[in-house]
C-alpha cells in the first residue's frame, strides 16, 4: 500500500487534515472518492460476471461431452498427448582427449571452462589446445 493510501486509511490522520480543510473541499473529495469506489465495484461485478459465464460454458460443454459419450478426462488426456515437450538437443561429440591426474584418458567437448588439467598443461608444459584434439 502506498503512503498516500496509508494516510487515507488512518482515521486520526484524516481528522487532523479535515480540521485544516473547508467543508466544501471535503464534500468534493467525498464525491470523487464515491465515484472511484463505484467504478471499482462495477469492475469487480463485471469480472465476477465473466467468471460465472465461463463456468457456465464449461459446465455446458462438459454436459455435451457426457451426452455424446465422451469422458472429459479422456479429452484432456488426448489433448495432453498431442502436446510435445521441448526436444532435447543431441549431446555434443568430444573434441579433445586428455589424461587426468589419475592416469585415465578422458574427453572434453570444448564447451565451458577449460578443464584444470588442460589449463595446467598449456600454462606449465607449454602445450597448445590443438595438442589435445582427437
Curated annotation (Swiss-Prot):
InterPro entries: H-NS-like_N, H-NS_C_dom, H-NS_C_dom_sf, Histone_HNS, Histone_HNS_N
DNA-binding region location: 111-116
Keyword set, alphabetical order: Cytoplasm, DNA-binding, Repressor, Transcription, Transcription regulation
Domain of life: Bacteria
GO MF terms held by the record: bent DNA binding; DNA-binding transcription repressor activity; minor groove of adenine-thymine-rich DNA binding; protein dimerization activity; structural constituent of chromatin; transcription cis-regulatory region binding
Annotated localization: Cytoplasm, Nucleoid
Entry's transmembrane regions: none
Cellular component terms (Gene Ontology): cytosol; nucleoid; protein-DNA complex
Family listed: Belongs to the histone-like protein H-NS family.
PANTHER family tied to this protein: DNA-BINDING PROTEIN H-NS (PTHR38097:SF1), PTHR38097
UniProt function note: A DNA-binding protein implicated in transcriptional repression and chromosome organization and compaction. Binds nucleation sites in AT-rich DNA and bridges them, forming higher-order nucleoprotein complexes and condensing the chromosome. As many horizontally transferred genes are AT-rich, it plays a central role in silencing foreign genes. A subset of genes are repressed by H-NS in association with other proteins.
Subunit structure: Homodimer that oligomerizes on DNA into higher-order complexes that form bridges between disparate regions of DNA compacting it. Interacts with YmoA and other similar proteins.
Name of protein: DNA-binding protein H-NS
Species this protein is from: Proteus vulgaris
Amino acid at each position: 500500500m502506498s503512503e498516500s493510501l496509508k494516510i487515507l486509511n488512518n482515521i486520526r490522520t484524516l481528522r487532523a487534515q479535515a480540521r485544516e480543510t473547508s467543508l466544501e473541499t471535503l464534500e468534493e473529495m467525498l464525491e470523487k472518492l464515491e465515484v472511484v469506489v463505484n467504478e471499482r465495484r462495477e469492475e469487480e461485478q463485471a469480472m465476477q460476471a465473466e467468471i460465472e459465464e465461463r463456468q457456465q460454458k464449461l459446465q455446458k460443454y462438459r454436459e455435451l461431452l457426457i451426452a455424446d459419450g465422451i469422458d472429459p478426462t479422456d479429452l484432456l488426456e488426448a489433448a495432453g498427448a498431442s502436446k510435445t515437450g521441448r526436444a532435447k538437443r543431441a549431446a555434443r561429440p568430444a573434441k579433445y582427449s586428455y589424461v587426468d591426474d589419475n592416469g585415465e584418458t578422458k574427453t572434453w567437448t570444448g564447451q565451458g571452462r577449460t578443464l584444470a588439467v588442460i589449463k595446467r598443461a598449456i600454462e606449465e608444459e607449454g602445450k597448445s589446445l590443438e595438442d589435445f584434439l582427437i
